Structures are given as C-alpha cells and as structure tokens.
Amino acid sequence: GAEARTFADKPLVTDFNDYEIRIEEVFRFNPEDTLVFHVTLRNKSDQEIRYLPESFCVRAGSRLYFQSISDAPGVLPPQSASTVYFAITGTPDGGRNELALKNEFSVLVTRLSPPPTPAVVTNRVVVPVKPLHTPRNQP
C-alpha cells in the first residue's frame, strides 16, 4: 500500500519569478522506497518556457534527490498550467532514501529557455544628423 499527503490546505510552492511549481500530492511506496510527486507547473509569463522533463529533483533539508522517472511535456505555453508526475526512488548511491511525507519539499527542474530579458528604457533624445557634405551628383 501507499501513504499519501495532500497539500490543498497549505500548498508547497517553489516560485521562480516567471513560473512556479506547486506540490499537489505526494505518495510514498515504502517497499519500493519510492515517492511519487503530483505537481502543477504554472507559467506566469507571456513567453513559452521549455524545461528538461527528465530533470526533476526534490530538495528535502540540505539534500537533493533526483527523479527516477517522469511524465512531463517539457514545455509550458504562456500563461498556462501543466500537471506533472515524477518519482524519486532510493538515493543516487543506490541506498534507501527513507524520505518521510512530512518533509518540507522544494521541487526543481532544469530550464532550457532563457528567462525573459528586461526592457531597457533610456531618456536619451535621438537627434537626426545631417551629412557633412552632399554626395556627388545630388543637389
């Protein structure tokens, strides 16, 4: 059997300015030492955001745990949300992670598209410049 924790009452959200990752539910399968995360990625910008669907990881305390599998599209259209599932199994060195559901998790993913560049505003006045001499054969 699996244990479950839902976050409807107090969502765990990792905010990255133009997008955020919200944990909806986490399931723990103890015999397999696997946690399955159900998360929502929300693009808050007007630009498409691309990410590596195989790059999900979770921070619990000071440690990072990398996904064993994911079901994710890899692209977030502007002003949209996407449901993603991914699993964490064991530790990178092959041991058991024994991660409890009560941890305060942060979800991370590797982004492919660069963040939007801020618009540059200047107060400089543009003055047209006349040529110093007239080109030949011109009045």
PLM-predicted stretches and their roles:
Residues G1-T14:
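A eukaryote-biased signal for short, well-structured alpha-helical docking elements
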Residues V36, Q47-S55, G95-K102:
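Short, hydrophobic/aromatic beta-strand segments
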Residues R63-V121, V126-P139:
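Short, solvent-exposed, Trp/other aromatic-anchored flexible loops in extracytoplasmic proteins
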